[in-house]
Regions:
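Bacterial N-terminal signal peptides
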Residues: 8-18
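N-terminal secretory signal peptides that target proteins for export/translocation
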Residues: 1-5
Length: 401
């Protein structure tokens, strides 16, 4: 979510991994009365949605899709694309720091088979949003781009369909939830473990659920979960400490997500410190459904996949959070009492080999997937470099939640 001038995107809760629902789950689809019009293919990487975009005829560039955010273009494209900057804004993110962003207009933006014209964008250094994430993104498309449409996201087909509101077939569209939009923030009423609240729906977040600090404090949620993993998430404005737990249920209208992986934020400033929101529902939850944002009609539709996608809400079994660098995987955090900590891996270490393979031959999504999806008891042999010395360690996965 990068909302209004609140610029944020969650990097990860430890290791967010790519997970594509089963491609044969096609008993549901985008609810339109007519043949598909504007169709935008996308990639799902690390539970982020990426589309291929052409800007003023140049590209293609990889843009992330955040229906709860504003439109952004990377600052590095301003000069080569001759974009005119007309003003500056100050934004806030998950942390306490402020960031600067410029204003510009993109005359032509091509996504899939659809062309947008004269769209307002902000310029921003997008490396701050997803540092070392293994995917170089050059822009973001958000709520202003989709405000005129019912926007359907089909995670199974990896397609976004822009539907004329008059052509939206509401009968088979699924469970309907009233939806509000303010400063590009899309919200619904939901409940976590029986506690109701107003939650943001955020396709810019790869996580299942993050609960804001005031909500956590008010309902004394930390004391309810003695079993947790302490970690951090980062983005614009710095990083935020959080406790990751497994809740009982997240209720969305008539639908329920059982045992959702949930981050309890510990923040004094930034988006996660907002008292007007209970929390943030991300793609880890949304990928269970065909999701239709009817912004003109102020409704959110959720159609569950049949059968349900596999491996939902499996959690990182290593305790590692890593980013990618040219020579390997840099250790960003090590959760206390986890296999990574017990193996002697430390923050700042560089993982140069994994099971005998150079880390440079393995993509970041692949290693994240391995560390989460391999069963408990699986052993990884890693070459770990501290300063100028390399040692071999054994990391044995186990269930942490």
């Amino acid at each position: 979510m990068i909302s209004g001038f609140f610029l944020r995107i969650t990097v990860a809760v430890l290791l967010a991994t790519p997970l594509c629902p089963a491609t044969d789950a096609h008993s549901v689809g985008c609810p339109t009365r007519r043949a598909p019009g504007a169709v935008i293919p996308f990639e799902l990487i690390g539970d982020h949605i990426y589309v291929s975009a052409k800007v003023n005829g140049s590209g293609p560039y990889r843009f992330i899709v955040d229906t709860g955010g504003v439109n952004l273009v990377d600052s590095s494209l301003v000069k080569p694309l001759s974009l005119q900057i007309t003003g500056q804004e100050t934004g806030h993110g998950v942390g306490a720091e402020t960031v600067e962003s410029g204003k510009t207009t993109i005359d032509r933006l091509d996504l899939g088979n659809h062309t947008f014209t004269s769209e307002k964008f902000y310029t921003f250094d997008l490396d701050q949003l997803y540092p070392g994430g293994g995917v170089k993104m050059m822009g973001m498309v958000g709520a202003p781009l989709f405000a005129r449409y019912a926007t359907c996201i089909d995670f199974s087909r990896h397609e976004i369909e822009l539907i004329n509101p008059a052509d939206l077939d509401r009968q088979p569209a699924g469970t309907v939830l009233p939806m509000s939009t303010k400063e590009s923030v899309i919200t619904i009423h939901a409940s976590f473990d029986g506690v109701p609240g107003v939650f943001q729906v955020d396709t810019g977040s790869p996580t299942t659920l993050t609960l804001n600090t005031p909500f956590v404090t008010k309902h004394d949620l930390l004391s309810r979960f003695p079993r947790h993993v302490e970690s951090s998430s980062g983005g614009v404005g710095g990083s935020v400490r959080e406790y990751t737990v497994r809740g009982k249920n997240l209720v969305l209208g008539s639908l329920s997500i059982v045992n959702p992986i949930t981050a309890l934020a510990v923040a004094s400033k930034g988006n996660f410190a907002r008292a007007d929101l209970a929390g943030n529902i991300g793609n880890g939850a949304l990928k269970r459904y065909v999701v239709t944002f009817d912004l003109p009609g102020h409704r959110l539709y959720l159609q569950p996949y049949e059968p349900a996608p596999p491996n939902l809400d499996t959690y990182n079994r290593s305790g590692l959070r890593i980013d990618v660098e040219p020579t390997g995987f840099r250790v960003v955090s090590v959760a206390k009492g986890t296999p990574a900590a017990e193996a002697g891996i430390r923050v700042g270490d560089l993982i140069v080999t994994v099971n005998g393979k150079p880390s440079t031959s393995i993509s970041l999504p692949e290693i994240r997937d391995e560390l989460r999806e391999r069963p408990a008891g699986s052993v990884f042999t890693m070459g770990v470099r501290t300063d100028d010395k390399t040692r071999e360690v054994q990391l044995t996965l186990r269930e942490l939640l």
